[in-house]
Regions:
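Charged, amphipathic alpha-helical linker segments immediately N-terminal to NTP-binding catalytic cores
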Residues: 1-8
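Conserved nucleotide-binding/hydrolysis micro-motifs of P-loop NTPases
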Residues: 75-77, 119, 157-160, 175-177
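Conserved catalytic network of the ASCE P-loop NTPase/AAA+ motor domain
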Residues: 30-32, 102-107, 141-149
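Conserved P-loop NTPase "ATPase switch" module shared by AAA+ and STAND
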Residues: 102-133
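Conserved RecA-like ASCE ATPase "motif II neighborhood" in helicase/translocase motors
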Residues: 95-100
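Conserved catalytic segments around the Walker B and adjacent sensor/switch elements
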Residues: 60-75
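Structural recognition of the conserved hydrophobic beta-strand(s) that form the central parallel beta-sheet
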Residues: 113-115, 137, 141, 145-157
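WD40-repeat beta-propeller superdomains and closely related acidic/aromatic-rich repeat-like regions
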Residues: 2, 15-37, 42-52, 56, ...
Length: 577
């Protein structure tokens, strides 16, 4: 495909040549005296979509042009289109209001591209979301009102965007066959018949995408929405739009379950088993009947929800070192510092230890089976004993050291903590990690500088047979870095670097070897097999501030959405990654 330039227009016709030149010039040079919106318009068959595709291809090769996010508006409502844009921007799937808030605080000048605006809208005809105008009023309009946002929009009509004096680039009708009708093909009545039988696994992509649109036209939407098989395989945009209709009588927990799962379900390229696993995870702890129905298909995925406590909002989480043959115990702290011990097997509450003086947890690390290291949101470290046993000397040494350092230099404020059987790690706002030997804390920490900005997460793993310790950090620079005591050096390149921020880390020595779990701010968990460098990505329906991985493949996540436990089939995970 030829790159559109001033001298080589990307589509036939004088209008396309003029539009190509004008668009490239506008995109490359943002100026206060220029419009902040461009509308690509023209009749059906004018080649608007092809024109934009060529522009996007050219922008990737032009250092003066950066398109930060592209949204495909056909068949979308404001909420699902916002999820698309949020993912491309590195924020993750955010609803329109939160996306607008994030962009308002984003220091970048941002360029967005939206295709097929005139074909946006989904769901029951009597709801505003069925119209493209709702996408403008609820999403694109507020985004365009931000001074750092520019936008290129494809639309059959200029007035739909309602932008103030946009640059309008009109295209001539292309030669050859007429393009698709400007009528919305998603919402138009379809002549295709309904699928025979309840097995959605055999349905075509077109049947899955449009089944609910047809059911709305025939008055059978409720029957489809109460079919768990359709919820696994159906259109995320169509289901999200239709569930907004409160006149539809549906099972009591369905809307809550779907609202939890839908942002993660909207990630492209998910396998059927992964969609089932996500929906099963959202139903676990909310709708036992639906969760049990989905469990057989969910268990064909390499990751499955074990248990979930969605009402148990938590600020920090740690797994206690225990007898390997035992069931294991996780300790969670809520936003007021109150502690609860949970069984790793089923999540049941085992105890509620007194945490002493109220505090505001930022992180927890297990130093011993009876004592945790707590990091307050103010940056103060303190031991958190679970029993009346004496606080270990290692906890006293490192808390005194770092709290004194913080008083002397606020830049040394701890930002993350982690611990293993032999070492504890304290990270700070200067990008450093202080590695403490727990059996000889009087020798002081070893300090390693891994980032040039604050550390957001840290994890350490003792490897006794190798006589080494692995240290992994995540930073505000969007990188994850690995340091190995065997070489006393960090890897020259990050393990991973993304637009999103690493918010929590888990590191464990498993039967498959050392495995690293990284929770990202865009609702993804990345699992790294460190020996082979293989990566498996899990979209998660939950927001998590804390993450823990155990040697037997239990992955725990905690945050404002509660506490959630996953079973990882590590052998299958790497086989399919």
């Amino acid at each position: 495909m030829a790159e559109p330039t001033v001298g080589a227009p990307p589509a036939p016709g004088a209008a396309a040549a003029h539009a190509a030149s004008a668009l490239l010039d506008w995109a490359a040079e943002p100026r206060p005296d220029r419009p902040r919106a461009v509308v690509i318009t023209g009749p059906s068959g004018a080649g608007k979509t092809r024109f934009l595709a060529q522009f996007l291809a050219a922008s990737g090769r032009n250092p003066r042009i950066t398109v930060h996010a592209t949204g495909f508006a056909e068949g979308q409502i404001a909420r699902t289109l916002a999820w698309q844009l949020g993912r491309h921007l590195g924020y993750g799937p955010l609803d329109p209001d939160r996306l607008t808030q994030r962009l308002r605080s984003d220091p970048r000048p941002v360029l967005l591209v939206v295709t097929d605006l005139h074909r946006a809208g989904r769901g029951p005809d009597h709801l505003p979301s069925a119209s493209p105008a709702a996408v403008v009023s609820e999403l694109l309009g507020p985004l365009l009102a931000l001074p750092n946002v520019r936008m290129i929009v494809e639309s059959d009509t200029v007035d739909l965007l309602r932008a103030e004096e946009p640059l309008v680039l009109g295209l001539d009708p292309a030669a050859g066959p007429t393009g698709p009708s400007s009528a919305d093909p998603v919402r138009a009545p379809a002549p295709a018949t309904a699928i025979a039988g309840p097995d959605w696994r055999t349905a075509t992509a077109e049947e899955r995408e449009h089944a609910l649109d047809r059911a709305l036209a025939t008055g059978t939407a409720r029957e489809l929405l109460t079919d768990p098989g359709y919820l696994v395989h159906g259109s995320v945009a169509a289901i999200t739009a239709t569930l907004a209709d409160t006149s539809l009588s549906l099972p009591r927990h369905l809307r809550e379950v779907w609202a939890t799962a839908a942002p993660a379900l909207s990630f492209p390229g998910l396998a059927d088993s992964e969609r089932a696993a996500l929906l099963h995870a959202a139903a676990t702890g909310r709708d036992p009947k639906l969760a049990e129905y989905l469990r057989p298909l969910a268990e064909t995925s390499s990751w499955t929800a074990l248990w979930s406590l969605p009402r148990r909002k938590s600020a920090a989480l740690a797994v206690l070192p225990t007898d390997p043959a035992g069931p294991g115990t996780a300790v969670a702290a809520d936003t007021l510092g109150r502690l609860t011990c949970h069984s790793l097997t089923d999540g049941r509450t085992l105890a509620s230890p007194d945490s002493g003086t109220p505090w505001t947890p930022e992180a927890l690390a297990a130093l011993t089976p009876t004592c945790l290291l707590g990091l307050d949101r103010s940056g103060i470290l303190h031991p958190v004993p679970l029993t009346t046993a004496t606080v270990p000397s290692s906890a006293a040494h490192l808390t005194l050291h770092h709290n004194a350092a913080t008083l002397a230099s606020p830049a040394d404020l701890p930002t993350a903590v982690a611990a293993g059987p032999r070492h504890a790690a304290v990270a700070d706002g200067r990008g450093r990690v202080h590695l403490w030997p727990l059996h000889s804390p009087e020798t002081g920490p070893r300090t390693i500088e891994l980032h040039r900005s604050a550390v957001t997460a840290v994890s350490c793993l003792d490897l006794p047979q190798a006589g080494a310790v692995l240290l992994v950090t995540g930073g505000l620079d969007g990188t994850v870095r690995l340091w190995d005591s065997a070489t006393a050096e960090a890897l020259p390149s990050p393990v991973e670097s993304r637009k999103a921020l690493p918010t929590a880390l888990g590191l464990a020595d498993t039967e498959a070897g050392p495995v690293l779990a990284v929770a990202w701010s865009d609702r993804r968990i990345h699992l790294w097999h460190l020996l082979s460098g293989r990566l498996a990505a899990l979209p998660t329906p939950h927001l998590g501030r804390a993450l823990t991985l155990t040697g037997d493949g239990h992955l725990l996540q905690a945050g404002r959405d509660g506490i959630h436990a996953w079973r990882l089939d590590l052998a299958a995970l790497w086989a399919t990654a």
